[in-house]
Structure formats: C-alpha cells, structure tokens
Amino acid sequence: MRFVFISFLYFLCFSSFIHSVELEELSYGDHVKQKIDFYPGSSDKVLVWIHGGGWIFSGKRETRWIRRLERYFKVNEELNIFSIGYRYGRNTAPQAADDTLCAYKFISEEVKKRGLSEDDVTLMGLSAGGHLACLLYT
C-alpha cells in the first residue's frame, strides 16, 4: 500500500504539465500523421520541436519527448511550441523529410497569422528529429 501511495505522489508531482494545457492540433496535410500540436505560450518566442524515434516509431505526444522539452524549457510559461508529427515507418524514407519541410512552411505562416516573432524561432529535435531539424536548417 505504501508503494502505491508513493507512486501516486510521484505521479502528482512529476507528471507532465504540458498535457494539462489546452493544445490546438493543426493539419498541414491529408495524412493522419501530418499534424502539428500547438502549445501557446506567454511571449512571442517560438520553438519548433521535432520528435525522434529512429524514423520508424514514436510520435509528437509521446511522454518521453514532452518530458525532455520540460526539462530544458519553461514549457507553456514562455515559449509557443509547435510540435511536428510526420509520417514514419518502413519504406517511408523521403516522407519524414518532406513532411517536416511542409510542416515548417505551414508553421511559418501560422507564426505570422498569430503575431508571433518571426525573428525568434528556434528549431530543434532529438534523435531522428535532430536529423530532420538539421535537414531543414540546411
């Protein structure tokens, strides 16, 4: 019983608060994975986040990616976060890169429409997402 109580306390203290903030899901294509989660922040700064997963699994809402964001940024206190979803899996090699480019173009328009800073946009990803971010940057 004590273990259950401690586990519950851990959950309350360390559960991801980004999930408690209302997010907006945006579509940049027709495929079910061509979605962007937008988490509004209090400033005009923008973070474009690309999840990892070896190009074959995972997703933009997977807890481990969200927790890594929370560890390094004041998530939803300051930054406006656009978390890109993309097609992945076997035999989808060019699709992830194509989707990321398409999503970034879509986000650029959203930044303008929402009156966010076009000069203060940070692009980052982890693992496969880091690779896709580098492809966008070049």
Residue ranges and their predicted role:
Residues 19-42:
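N-terminal cap/lid segment of alpha/beta-hydrolase-fold proteins
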Residues 61-82:
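Short amphipathic alpha-helix adjacent to the substrate-entry channel of hydrolases
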Residues 125, 129, 133:
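Gly/Ala-rich beta-loop-alpha elbow adjacent to hydrolase catalytic centers
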